Amino acid sequence: MKIQTKKGMLMLTDGNSDNASARIRALQYIPFFEDQGYSVTHVPRVPLRPSNLISKCIFYPLFKRWYSFKIFLAIVFGKWDIVFIQRIFISSLLIKKLNRRSIPFVYDFDDAIYINPKRPNNREKTANMVRFANKVIVSTEYLNEFCLSFGQIPEIITSPVETDRIRPSEKQKNQMLTIGWMGSPWTSGFLKLIEKPLQRLANKYTFRFLTVGARSDYKISGINHIAKPWVFADENENIGQMDIGLMPLPDTDWTRMKGGYKLLQYMSAGIPCVASPVGINQTIVKPGENGFLAAIDEEWYQMLEMLINDHELRIKLGSNGRGEAIELYSREVCFEKLLKIIQKL
């Protein structure tokens, strides 16, 4: 009986499971790759960030250097059939090494990593990765256009949502209607865009505003506001408490490249969403079918008022969104697209 040799895959990521992009765009695919006969070796750019202050100040910088060296060793001496690089940059020397060894590499990124005022050379680093990758995968049409300018025709795969983990939940009968937002300390600055409509609604309707992952010092006056830290294990429970999910975004070069993952999570949980008409939001949100788009204060007010007053509409839009999340954006659907790309290399 012939024993089938496993295909060696080196997976280089921007971080560990505590890094959202690495977890969503790469790490959650590892079991799927292994089921398809790949032996996956994961090397992150940085180690898990320690909570201890001394370790963070003294040992973490040393470990970061060691992990960079591990990437160098893996590329130069490892035996691989494919290298999957998520978001990070590798040197021209290492790119040439892969080419000389006839090892194809896939480059995946999901944000405008080339726009960083503090690191202006990121644009050239990103362009270099795009030019020499055997295949580039991006999350939005806007990132696709960036790659085309460097002669690369990428594939678009949205950030996959775990529809088996993030599911509709049974709401408590007497639970107060909850308008929710989930994000990060950095993106909580975008909440300024919806504060006035929410405050105006609070003068007329009874609801609570749940923020998950916002800055610890974020406050909004005149509203029943509940703030929770983002914890992966609590993600489904927190989203499940929401009746309406929000994604406000300013219209900038950087936000137009965002992947809309928050919307996909709301949809997976079966709740309607209201979002700014920026970037991929305009593709994901189908007004009147799975949510609404709102560009100005009055539109935010009107869309939210409509959803507050119409329970059946919330159920309908949420159900439609759940169906689309499973059919178009689930981890299984996205992995099938990714696998076909890799198998052709």
Predicted regions and their residues:
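Membrane-proximal helix-turn-helix segments that form the acceptor-binding/catalytic region
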Residues: F69-G78, S92-R101, Y107, D111-V136
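Conserved acidic donor-binding segment of nucleotide-sugar-dependent glycosyltransferases
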Residues: P287-E298, M306-E312
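Nucleotide-sugar-dependent
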Residues: G189, I226, A233, E237-S268, ...
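Donor nucleotide-sugar binding/catalytic pocket of nucleotide-sugar-dependent glycosyltransferases
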Residues: I113-Y114, R131-R167
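A short, well-ordered alpha-helix in the C-terminal region of glycosyltransferases
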Residues: M306, L313-L328, C334-K340
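Nucleotide-sugar donor-binding and catalytic loop/hinge architecture
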Residues: K2-K7, D164-T178, K316, K344
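An aromatic- and histidine-rich active-site surface loop
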Residues: D14-D18, R23, V83-S102, L191
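Conserved catalytic-core segment of nucleotide-activated headgroup transferases in glycan assembly
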Residues: S17-F32, Q36, T163-R165, Q172-Q241
